[in-house]
Amino acid sequence: MKKSTKKLCAIAALGTLFSSSLCLAAGPNANAASEGKWLSGDFHQHTLYTDGSTTFDFVMEKSNEFGLDWWANSEHGGGRNRDGNGVFWDTYIPNPILGNYAVSGGHQIMWRWQSLRDFVYPQILDTRSLYPERRAFSGFEWNVPGHEHCSTAIVAKDMAEDASAISAFEYQFDKSDKDTSRNSENTPYGTLTKTNVTHADAVTACQWMQDQYEDGGIDNAWIIFAHIERNGIAATGGYDVNDFRDFNNAGPDVAFGFEGAPGHQVNTFRGFGNALTCDENGVCISSEEDEPYDFGGTYGGVGYYTAEVGGLWDAMLGEGRRWFNFANSDYHKHYTAGGDDFYPGEYQKTWVYAVDKDGDGAYSYNEIADGMRSGNTYFAHGDLITHLEFEAQDNNRKASMGGELVADGAIKNLKIKITFKSPETNNCVADGTYISACAEPKVHHIDLIAGDITGLIDPEKEPEAYTDPTNPTTRVIATFAANSWETDKNGNNVIVYHLKDVDKSMYFRLRGTNLAPNTPDETDAVGNPLPDALVTRNQGIDGAQEAWNDLWFYSNPIFVYVK
């Protein structure tokens, strides 16, 4: 039986801060003293199986070529008419398609529950054999009922069950899967039933995955929401803060984050943060006048929900929620072939600290998934950094990203230590066509951001607070430039900062960039990122060049509780 966050939550009283923190802290502990390793990954990428432009094997090869330690095949649910090489399913002899008959583009489609199980998974096994030092997960991009997209993956005790479990999830809960042929089918994961229309169905899906994880039907899983600003608010098919709170409440061990930095970073709108226009005063708004949202696109390649200090992400962290931030390529088609994308690992990476729990000298699928859930992760653009340690310490108590430090009373001297490293070069190549110049990846400054933790919000007792996507207590409390750090013999840059008399519960997170404050059309006077549309509008810088000019990294938070 898995250790259940959900069951602890049922016992804990929502009204008290400290019981809420205990409720949220259950599960893998980022503070464990076990030996581990930082591993780079990408878990959102597409092939010819769905709407990608290149073969399955090609995308796996690129993931390996750009040095990723792990990745997930994670492409759309529903139904598609071709395999991973672009061959139409209905040209196979004999025709292998199961389920209800449906056609797209003049060819019969195969429902994704079948292709994931019967065709994609065997290719994932081949990939694992071809790249034995890498880890290739079985995943898919869930079309979320009532909303947009989400990256999911499952790890099972018997690896062959990865595919059957994710097939059962897709069949039941993907809003684009119209097949009904498996209704009432008995599986190791329960009796299948279509539950794929409303937001409530999406919450049920998170609950289903949580139950499978708790009951041992699967070893591990993640549900991480993708390009979360692209469709705007929930009323227009996107997400509101209460949606994420609902998902996390239903599946605290599996639904634990989102992509703060969307893929498609070469696109004019840096990941479709929603299309926008900017006026002569630099005010950026949605390009469609009748759209009831205004996110202003991406800011330094990062969506509004994450980039806005005191915004939606901070609202969730202010509850003490273990809700973490990730980044991926969302590769479909490379920019040199007319697409909007970098290859997996070429530009954005999510770094996960995986712990070798069984001491075998390797890092398993389970250990990597546990690392993601721990929150001891960060993401970076363009290899701005390739190593980050972020710790808070009070005497002999210490916590890393995703972890918590609990003090019996006010902390007289909270020590914050940041250790980071940048490589000499990255993957930028000045080809004279798409990219005219490349700069070395070098951090200009790092912001230390903090906010108060006030406890979980009860949606029944505090309905207005539950839908509030802000945390007004969040602020930048310190900024560190090159004169603030020392470089050790290994080339690591080390920052030590002391915060005096901490008498309330708080969280701390980092962001860093290669850009100075007041960089025209990129940052404001204090270094906050500006809407990415400005530099295109005012200077004509766009595409891959814009992305390589404008590099950021974001850490995940440390939680400090004062009783």
Regions found by a protein language model. Give the residues of each.
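C-terminal functional module detector
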Residues: 26-38, 46, 50, 56-60, ...
